[in-house]
């Protein structure tokens, strides 16, 4: 039995604990403080740290956590630079096994060159690649890379639960509404998430099958999305990759 525990950090980050009995893994600990507080409150032993990419708000707590738990294993992306840490660096197709839980590593370049995601047991820990209602900015990769990465994640089973690293859902959905104002799934999702946030509750995890209905970055082949992107770009777009590139540029200034 595995339980995922939400640990809010900074302004809008989420750090995830995967718990099994009195042991746990932590995903993208940008800040050690709230993680250590939660581990102490629940009397949990930290067995391993999983990193999706090298940005500071995802790795900033690693040193302090390893100081408190020196036997914890560190895992991270092979193709993202982590010069300050020694760990096991993972590539596409690698696998982590922990207390019967198998997590497959998926290389998802776009946000960074080496970004990876972890998938298994119906869970997807995807860092800053796929957000609920949106996707990450392109700091290092190309639009074509990010589109391909999102397509790989979108091919996972419908009931996959998405544990991304930021609470961006409402702003993502407002952009989605600008792209597809007649999409009832977007309208309904805005209402649902607004209520959750008013109660101080996270919008995550999100179900992948639902994301396909309202996340415009997963809907680039839809005529309604293509039409809006062409209207914004003032030109015809030949394929879903071109549509994605326009959407990502549009979202950057939305």
UniProtKB/Swiss-Prot annotation:
Binding-site residues, Zn(2+) 2: 57-58, 128, 166
Enzymatic class: hydrolase
The entry's keywords: Hydrolase, Metal-binding, Zinc
Chain positions recorded as Zn(2+) 1 binding sites: 53, 55, 111, 128
Reactions mediated catalytically: an S-(2-hydroxyacyl)glutathione + H2O = a 2-hydroxy carboxylate + glutathione + H(+)
Pfam families membership: HAGH_C, Lactamase_B
InterPro entries attached to this UniProt entry: Clx_II_MBL, Glyoxalase_II_hydrolase, HAGH_C, Hydroxyacylglutathione_Hdrlase, Metallo-B-lactamas, RibonucZ/Hydroxyglut_hydro
Enzyme Commission number(s) from the entry: 3.1.2.6
GO molecular function: hydroxyacylglutathione hydrolase activity; metal ion binding
Metabolic or biological pathway, per its Swiss-Prot or TrEMBL entry: Secondary metabolite metabolism; methylglyoxal degradation; (R)-lactate from methylglyoxal: step 2/2
Cofactor(s) listed: Zn(2+)
GO biological process, alphabetically ordered: methylglyoxal catabolic process to D-lactate via S-lactoyl-glutathione
Cofactor details (free text): Binds 2 Zn(2+) ions per subunit.
Ranges in a coiled coil: none
HAMAP family: Glyoxalase_2 (MF_01374)
Family assignment from sequence similarity: Belongs to the metallo-beta-lactamase superfamily. Glyoxalase II family.
Function comment: Thiolesterase that catalyzes the hydrolysis of S-D-lactoyl-glutathione to form glutathione and D-lactic acid.
Subunit-level organization: Monomer.
Record-linked PANTHER family: HYDROXYACYLGLUTATHIONE HYDROLASE, HYDROXYACYLGLUTATHIONE HYDROLASE GLOB
Name listed for the protein in its UniProt record: Hydroxyacylglutathione hydrolase
Gene: gloB
